[in-house]
Amino acid sequence: MRIEDFSLKLIPSSPGVYLMKDVHDQVLYIGKAKNLKNRLASYFHEKGDSRERIPFLMKKTASIETIVVSNETEALLLENNLIKQHHPKYNVLLKDDKTFFCLAISLSHSWPKVEAIRTKAITSSQRQLIFGPYVSAEACHTLLEVISQWFPLRTCSDREFALRKRPCILYDMKRCLAPCVGYCTPEEYQGTLDKAILFLKGKIEEVVKDLEKVIQKASDNLEFEQAANYYRTLSLIKQAMAKQQVEKFHFQNIDALGLYRHKQRTILTLLTVRSGKLLGARHFSFFENAQEDQDLLSSFILQYYVSQPYIPKEILTPLPLEFPTLSYVLNAESPPRLRSPKTGYGKELLDLAYRNAKAYAATTLPSSTLPYQDFQNILRMSQYPYRIECYDNAHMQGAHATGVYIVFENNGFDPKQYRTFSIDSEKTQNDLALLEEVLLRRFHSLTTALPDMIVVDGGKTHYNKTKKIIQTLNLTGIQVVTIAKEKSNHSRGLNKEKIFCETFPEGFSLPPTSNLLQFFQILRDEAHRFAISKHRKKRGKALFEQEKIPGIGEVKRKRLLQKFKSWKQVMLSSQEELEAIPGLTKKDIAVLLARQKDFNKSD
């Protein structure tokens, strides 16, 4: 029904879903209601809805479609399905998520191992012990490192385990019992595994006591290096477990949601408590979300938890949810309890979630917010750029050149869409030629969504070059912006930045406090960080290839680097030092000494 023909008299007072569309019949927003007439009436009454984003939404709405359903549950499910189908701009829409990390022990193998997996990889058909989830990948891998140091279980794949004929380097480092070649009995291995399981369950007292005894024994035997290694392990255990202890929650499994809005941006923070331990926080960012707070929370909970293999017994929300059927829809057999506590430990956890959401907004953006209005007021753009790509490159005197682009969309940076381009060394002598190579390869295939804006680290020359390439490729609707430091122009010791764009092809400057300037600087810094990291990785691979010596395999190379720390030190080592490395044959040492002569000549 078109807006000019819209009449509340034609809308039923029934549960249902409504779709707001623009002049091109594109769905802008999808909402649900217990009473369609009352809900839609609030959009047309001056005092019906005080949210500042509603007038903005109504200006773009050309028609409204309604779908009547039988009850609230059907409305909730239909809304969720339609959001996934139409991807409306002003609704919460969670991207494909990698979910949390867990530690898993497969019980189907005769010699189980501990490994990190994503929660979406957990299936009921597998016999597994699951620990977690851990919101932070760092926390998960810290625990893996502790287990590797103190509980020498295998870490190899099942295929590698079956094919191995002799123990790997981890056995020499005392990080594996080498069950692959029968160096331990099943009882010995199971005893070590049981200790690891106790540790992961949080029962670290016995492990700590054992470690303290071993440290004391090593010290008494004057084995100070070994004692120091054990002490570092003990510190790592206490640090990893101490971060998670929260006695207030009495071993409960709880998720708490914090909601923070600032102008056109919304932050939703999810705090996870498992077995009474606060595991961390995850943040979700949405731009121009037009949903009411209760609707946003309901939509998020439904989208997020239906894809999770584990749902906590309790989900805390900052507001009581309108639809009591939500809990039932999530899990009909054992539905989670949804509540909004006003006092007690639950309220403290909700306050913590809110503070985390607010802090995340402050640390991920300039002081006020993203420069949505500045794109119109300063750059004179007719609409906000929803997809921005920022380009940069990195090389070392022309070698190992790498071009990249990063992607910024409504929800912030999207690393899954970042791309890397390896550049021929002939084209790295000219920075503009390198830029052209990257852009041509980027737009050679149009299977990836086109950007609304391209940002390049450079000045007027880079702006003209980028603009020319875009025009040559017949690409329309793409804004080009370049940003560069002004040469020989300092203000209070700081370089000024100059921005070039279609409105200001000769460039213009903004004060350092400008949100627009800070936004472009954030984009440029992220692209530069990504380019440098990929360049270093490429250079590292090249150095690795140089280190390859006939007869010196991966295991021997690791032993050499473990002893000498760098390949340069290997090339400077003596014959006596090489002979002390376990596993090196006389032939290996002769090959290394011959390579040392070539190395010293080139040096």
Swiss-Prot record:
One of its GO terms (biological process) is SOS response. It holds the Pfam family UvrC_RNaseH_dom. Residues 205-240 form the UVR domain. One of its GO terms (molecular function) is DNA binding. The keyword Glycosyltransferase does not apply. It is found in: Cytoplasm. Its main location: cytoplasm. GO terms for cellular component: cytoplasm; excinuclease repair complex. It comes from the Bacteria. Residues 13-92 form the GIY-YIG domain. Keywords: Cytoplasm, DNA damage, DNA excision, DNA repair, Excision nuclease, SOS response. The keyword Signal does not apply. Interacts with UvrB in an incision complex. Belongs to the UvrC family. The UvrABC repair system catalyzes the recognition and processing of DNA lesions. UvrC both incises the 5' and 3' sides of the lesion. The N-terminal half is responsible for the 3' incision and the C-terminal half is responsible for the 5' incision. PANTHER family: UVRABC SYSTEM PROTEIN C (PTHR30562:SF1), UVRC/OXIDOREDUCTASE (PTHR30562). This is UvrABC system protein C. It comes from Chlamydia pneumoniae (Chlamydophila pneumoniae).
